[in-house]
A protein has these predicted regions:
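Flexible loop/hinge segments at secondary-structure junctions
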Residues: 1-274
C-alpha cells in the first residue's frame, strides 16, 4: 500500500533535510519483514501485521506504526465489459477457488443483470511473493466464505487453488492490464495509475461500494480506539458506505535509541505523520 505515498514523502522531506538519503524498495510485505528481522534495513513497512512468532524472533523490539489507510481493489480486464461490475464475497471466493470460470457465469450475471457479460474464460492473477496485499485480500475472503476459510485460509503466503502468479502489485497490475479476461487484486493506487477497471464490492450493510478516499475513510472511522500494539484490523467492518477490503499499512520500526539512522527515521516519521 505504502510505496506510492512514501516515495512522495521522501521526495518532499529531502527538500527540507538534504542530509538524509532514502533507499526504499517495493518488495512485498513478506520481504520487508524478513529484511527488518535480519537487520539489513533500518525500517520496513507491511500491509499485514507481523505475527507473534515473527515478533518473538526479532533481535530488537519492533513497533508497528499505522501510517496510512489503503484498499485492495478487485481489478479486471474484459473486452466489452465496461466499468461498473459488482461482486459479492461468495462470488469472489468462488472465482479465486477456480469454481467460477466464465465471465457470463450465472452467479456474476445475477449481481449484474444489466451488464453484457461475455463467455470469456476468467484468468485469475494473484501474487507469487509473500504479500500483505494477499493477507488483506485472503482475510476478507475467509471472512465471507466458509469454504475459502476451510480450504485456503488467510496469510501473506497461501496455497492458491488456481491462477497465475505475478510479483508485486506492479506485476499483478501489468498482467491484468495486458490480458483479456483477467481478474486480480491490487492496491488502489496501482489500479488508478494503470487505469484498470475495478469492481464495487458488497459490504456488510449489503451495499456495493467502490474503493475511494471516502469509502476507505469510512472503514477507518469505525475504529474508535487502537489496541496497545496498534495492529487493529478494519477488514470487512460493519458501517454505511464502507469499502470492505480496506486496511492499514504499518511502518515497522525497530527500537534502538542509540541508533543514528533510526533517529533520522523517527524524525522523518514525525514530519510525515504529524
Amino acid at each position: 500500500f505504502i510505496y506510492p505515498i512514501v516515495t512522495k514523502w521522501f521526495s518532499e522531506y529531502q527538500k527540507t533535510n538534504k542530509e538524509v538519503e532514502f533507499n526504499y524498495q517495493s518488495i512485498g510485505s513478506g520481504g520487508g519483514i524478513k529484511q527488518v528481522l535480519s537487520q539489513t534495513v533500518d525500517f520496513g513497512a507491511t500491509d499485514a501485521p507481523m505475527t507473534t512468532e515473527e515478533l518473538n524472533s526479532a533481535k530488537k523490539p519492533i513497533r508497528h506504526i499505522p501510517a496510512i489507510l489503503g484498499a485492495v481493489t478487485v481489478a479486471y480486464n474484459v473486452k466489452g465489459l465496461e466499468a461498473g461490475l459488482k461482486l459479492d464475497g461468495e462470488t469472489m471466493a468462488n472465482i479465486f477457488l477456480g469454481k467460477v470460470t466464465k465471465w457470463n457465469d450465472p452467479s456474476i450475471a445475477k449481481i449484474n443483470p444489466k451488464a453484457k457479460l461475455p463467455a470469456t474464460d476468467i484468468l485469475v492473477v494473484r501474487r507469487s511473493d509473500g504479500s500483505g496485499t494477499t493477507a488483506v485480500y485472503s482475510t476478507f475472503l475467509a471472512d465471507v466464505s466458509k469454504e475459502w476459510k476451510e480450504k485456503v485460509g488467510a496469510g501473506k503466503n497461501i496455497n492458491w487453488p488456481t491462477g497465475i502468479g505475478a510479483k508485486g502489485n506492479e506485476g499483478v497490475t501489468a498482467m491484468v492490464a495486458q490480458t483479456d479476461g483477467a481478474i486480480g487484486y491490487v492496491e488502489l493506487a496501482y489500479a488508478i495509475n494503470s487505469k484498470l477497471a475495478t469492481a464495487s464490492i458488497k459490504n456488510k450493510k449489503g451495499e456495493f461500494v467502490a474503493a475511494s478516499v471516502d469509502s476507505i475513510t469510512r472503514a477507518g472511522a469505525t475504529l474508535k480506539d487502537f489496541s496497545g500494539d496498534l495492529t487493529n484490523n478494519v477488514i470487512n467492518v460493519d458501517g454505511k458506505g464502507v469499502y470492505p477490503i480496506s486496511s492499514f499499512s504499518w511502518i515497522l520500526l525497530p527500537q534502538d535509541p542509540a541508533s543514528e539512522p533510526l533517529k533520522a527515521v523517527r524524525a522523518f516519521l514525525g514530519w510525515a505523520l504529524k
